Amino acid sequence: MKRIYVFLPAAALLLAAACSPSQPAAESDFTRFVDPKIGTGGHGHVFVGANVPFGMVQVGPTSIPQEWDWVSGYHRSDSTVIGFSHTHLSGTGIGDLFDVTVMPVVGEVTYARGTEDDPSSGLWSYADRTREIVRPGYYSVPLTRYGVTAEMTATSRVGLHRYTFPASDAAAVVFDLENGGCWDKATDTGFRFSDDSTRISGWRYSTGWARDQRVYFAAEFSKPFAKFETVGDKYARASFSTTDGEQLLVKVALSPVSVEGAETNLAAELPEWDFEATAAAADKAWNDELSKVKIATEDETAKRIFYTALYHTMVAPSVFCDVNGDYRGSDYEIHRAPGFTNYTTFSLWDTYRAAMPLMTILHP
């Protein structure tokens, strides 16, 4: 693994040199310096949630969209949550994605985005931001409307949710395929469900920044649902009875190619139900990448700023192919190239000056 040692404040110049003659004090835990909430105010537009470096899945909260500054789905001034979407942009100047939104609920709900001036108008809940936890590869927040604590972590192609429910005969997980990021609009959606009451799958086609975007998903629950119902072709509800403090896990895998591709990705990347091990693996993936650059300073604030910025450079571009290499090309045909990984969300007009040159050093 390439190691780069950087002396502040001339970090940018010394990154280009790719090394220094002096060795800083040994450091092994770099994720502890990352504060994913840096950049969530003003015009920062950064993603908050769980992912791994360059992962296809960025699973995290999506608020009721308001203005341009909500294009990542999260703004520190807003505590609404309409669900946890599996794709997000970060740091961009335009909105899109928010594909396959999932929301744990209790009781009857209105199947819509809703408005903040009417709490019963949609699926949304306020989040208790005072108890919100976010670190590389892990996100957690209590939803005050439903009394549910939502946690999530991820592999490259799979989001893993853990919901802690109150005692209820009306607990449920709602899949929302209508929700999209700002200018994104669903054009074709649908669901399938299995006979064993533990799996559902489907697709979401949309238009927006990407004129014809196609995402397929496969989801699996840690226990059978008591009832499954669809509301049109854009919403589905899997219902459960829960005891107080019961934890329900949900895996959601994505594919740019097909439902079968999503099922293959799920089986390959997350066959087990070990939430803690998955979160630890995500943390390790981030630590491995962050440790490629070491800075010679004892200033904790400088480390927090530096490693958070480095973390943000690896939210995108994101993998956009299946584990077997299948991907959908710009010609909308399915391709497979051995040894090739397809990526998307480059947003080159934002990144070509600094982030892309950095990629040539850290990820040649």
Give, region by region, the residue ranges found by the protein language model:
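Bacterial N-terminal signal peptides that target proteins for export
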Residues: M1-L8
